[in-house]
A protein has these predicted regions:
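ABC-type nucleotide-binding domain
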Residues: 1-213
């Protein structure tokens, strides 16, 4: 599922509500029919995997960056990387999982850093994967390449994606269009294009290079 809308429409607020950084003034947020208010905050946040637009790669090797505090051994990690389709990336690196990385991933491209940051969260196997404008700082060419990897990683997973470039969420099962804190449209990319509403307008403007939100 993807959220789109102009700046200030409430996209990031929804993510903060889901993480219980804010509490809703009315209504409910349910995960598997359970009100998140009934889930201890620590448990809830362990259920969620959040990828933000600002990635952080620390100095160390690739394996350490991916495992963090998990108990995975390198063989398990290699198998997971293969399942996630990271083998092509690892083949590019001189020592694969043992390749040393500079702080903030200075020896990786922006797309490679983002792919590792997404994989790091996915490896935890969260109940819900949340991506908050995770490709915001990429040029369109890098983003298009990364998008193919993300579509494979996100398949068969529950994912909420906040998008600033509409081309990245065209394959989403459902797109929710927000404006001024309200839901104004919902549907697939094709359905929303046919409605000729706000989504259509934003899509047309963005294709012409006028809007990037």
């Amino acid at each position: 599922m993807a959220f789109v809308g102009p700046t200030g429409s409430g996209k990031t607020t929804i993510i903060r509500l889901l993480c219980r950084l804010y509490e809703p003034q009315s209504g409910q947020i349910l995960i598997d029919d359970i009100d998140i208010k009934d889930i201890p905050i620590a448990t809830l946040r362990n259920m969620l995997g959040v990828v933000l637009q600002d990635t952080f790669i620390f100095s160390g090797n690739v394996a350490d960056n991916l495992k963090l505090n998990s108990n995975l051994d390198n063989l398990q990690l290699e198998n997971l990387c293969y399942e996630l389709g990271l083998d092509n990336l690892l083949k590019k690196l001189p020592e694969g999982l043992n390749t040393s990385l500079r702080e903030r991933g200075g020896n990786l491209s922006s797309g490679e850093r983002q792919l590792l940051s997404v994989a790091r969260v996915v490896i935890r196997n969260p109940v819900v994967l949340i991506m908050d404008e995770a490709t915001a700082f990429m040029d369109p060419s890098t983003e298009a390449t990364l998008q193919k990897d993300l579509e494979r990683i996100l398949s068969k997973r529950t994912a909420l994606v906040i998008a600033h470039r509409l081309a990245t969420i065209e394959s989403s099962d459902k797109i929710l269009v927000l404006k001024g804190g309200s839901l104004v449209e919902e549907g697939t990319h094709s359905e929303l294009r046919l409605k000729k509403g706000l989504y259509f307008q934003l899509s047309e403007l963005q294709q012409k290079g006028f809007v990037n939100f």
